[in-house]
Structure formats: C-alpha cells, structure tokens
Amino acid sequence: MSNIPTDLRYAATHEWVRPEGDGVFTVGISEHAQGLLGDMVFVELPDVGDAVSTGDDICVAESVKAASDVYAPISGEVVEVNEDLEDSPELVNSDPYGDGWLFKIKADDAAEVEGLLDAEGYENSIDEE
C-alpha cells in the first residue's frame, strides 16, 4: 500500500494539498500516482499568476510510461512553482510529499480544502480503482 500522510488532503484524481498558512496551499501528486506513472522525465508546470478553478488541468507530468494531466484540487491563483523539477523531475518519484511538490495556490476559498478527501477517504478511493 502506498504511503498516504494523514496531515494532507487529497483529490480523487491523486493530487495532495498541504496548508502553508495565509490561504496558501502546496500541491503535488500522491505516491500512488507517481508509482503508476513510473520514472518522471519532464514536468510541465503552470505559470505563476495563473488563475485556476477546481478540476482545471494545469500541469502535465510526463514519465517513461505516459503523460498525465495534473488537475487543480482547489480554485485560486498559482503563486509559486517548484523550479527544481525543471532539472530534476525525478524528485516527484523520490519525494512526492516533500521536494517533489509541484506548485502552490493562494486559495479563493480556503474552506474548499475541507471538501477534499482525508487520508482514509483517499485510501478507500484507491482501493476502488
């Protein structure tokens, strides 16, 4: 079973969300998702300043197996991207919940995060795949 940290919230589309304070949330893809994709070769990140709505495809993770869209788990504005991924996309594989984060969003409504899955809910959604 994949590592599913209990302090994060999850979208059914395998993105995780971590609060950073002041309505800013870090977003990445779960260990389960990176395991399905395999070794990352390129990550196409959104632009800082992009306004996104929940469910928008705003990022692409390309692996040796496939290219997969990454969706905005919450609405808001992209305020930072993980530029380390340009040279080291494999960080998504080696540390998906740490150095492999993708981008940060300033939420339009921070309460939207409460509608995402907790660790148990996300684990159940994986089990149903």
UniProtKB/Swiss-Prot annotation:
**Keywords linked to the UniProt accession:** Lipoyl
Necessary cofactors: (R)-lipoate
Q: Cite the Lipoyl-binding domain residue spans from the record.
A: 24-106
Tell me where in this chain the PTM N6-lipoyllysine is found.
65
Mind telling me which PROSITE patterns this protein's record contains? BIOTINYL_LIPOYL, LIPOYL
Q: Which GO terms describe its biological process?
A: glycine decarboxylation via glycine cleavage system
Cofactor binding description: Binds 1 lipoyl cofactor covalently.
Biological role stated in the UniProt entry:
The glycine cleavage system catalyzes the degradation of glycine. The H protein shuttles the methylamine group of glycine from the P protein to the T protein.
The name under which this protein is listed is Glycine cleavage system H protein
